A protein has these predicted regions:
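Cytosolic catalytic domains that perform sulfur/thiol-centered chemistry
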Residues: 1-296
Length: 296
């Protein structure tokens, strides 16, 4: 199909493109061409802005309100993509999963795969919310708005994420056995190359293992996920026990590519709740003098 307009009304498509440090404007690119009917999900905007860290998980209320305004409710199947293969879409997937929405999928290969398969592109702003079924917001009085009955209602699943305290406990063994896997490049992991964000120490969390996120993706422009067998091999070669019933915490620079590993582990057959993401990741850990580091 060339347009999501031809899909059942139960499906919503979301562009969750995000870029790090290369002066690209994801929303501008969305306006220049996106999957027809898609809405734009800004991970920096739909976030907890009370914290000094980037794109941290928003509150239930904020997520409910913003997702409802996109015309998405709890009955919808959400399909997420980004413009760079499989880079930031998994972060949006993980966010929906954090709020207990399980009918959420990532378009493998993203927008490049859509175009390669002959999919058409739509230019300009997304549809006005008022034209979308189940828009999710109704005006109560004056400037006050409230959730429509069919809007999105969030309920946080704490099993999907970890705080720095929980990571520290697992790193030292105080929180029980389990593993921590880092999605950054080996150079960053070993503090051989500087972090892209200023003010961060180099190195990695003690006892963590390095599995660069691109290793679970195919090479090339589409960057699709490898097969389940290949993904398992990548993790196992790094010393990761994919079949363990113990927690396997995914971390990275700021919680984006850690979600790539979390999704890859689900592709490999692991329950997502057993592969939580450390939301603050190295942006938080590497900025704190009171947290232990290896290689800095």
């Amino acid at each position: 199909m060339n347009s999501l307009e031809t899909f059942p009304d139960t499906i919503r498509c979301v562009d969750a493109s995000w870029h790090l440090g290369n002066n690209r404007d994801a929303h501008k690119e969305f306006l220049e061409g996106h999957v027809p009917g898609a809405t734009f999900f800004d991970i920096d905007d739909i976030a907890d802005k009370t914290l000094p860290l980037p794109h941290m998980l928003p509150s239930e209320e904020v997520f409910s309100r913003r997702v409802s305004s996109m015309g998405i409710n709890n009955d919808h199947t959400v399909v997420i993509y980004n413009t760079a293969g499989s880079f930031s879409a998994p972060r949006c997937w993980w966010t929906f999963r954090c709020f207990n929405h399980k009918k959420v999928h990532v378009l493998d290969g993203g927008l490049p795969a859509w175009v390669a398969e002959g999919g058409m592109l739509e230019v300009g702003e997304e549809k006005a919310v008022s034209t979308r079924p189940s828009a999710g917001l109704v005006q109560a009085s004056g400037n006050a708005w409230k959730l429509k009955e069919k809007g999105f209602k969030s309920r946080l699943n704490p099993a999907m994420l970890r705080s720095w305290r929980q990571v520290l406990e697992q790193s030292t063994g105080e929180g029980g056995k389990g593993q921590i896997v880092d999605a950054r490049s080996l150079g960053r992991f070993l503090a051989q190359v500087p972090e892209p964000r200023k003010g961060l120490a180099g190195g990695h969390i003690p006892s963590s293992l390095c599995v660069p996120f691109n290793h679970v993706l195919e090479e090339g422009n589409l960057a699709k996920f490898r097969t389940a067998t290949e993904i398992r091999q990548v993790f196992e070669e790094a010393g990761v026990d994919v079949d363990s019933s113990l927690p396997l915490i995914a971390t990275c620079g700021s919680g984006v590519t850690a979600a790539v590993l979390a999704l890859a582990l689900e592709v490999a057959g692991r329950d997502a709740e057993r592969s939580p993401v450390y939301d603050g990741s190295w942006t938080e850990w590497g900025s704190r003098d009171d947290l232990p580091k290896v290689g800095s």
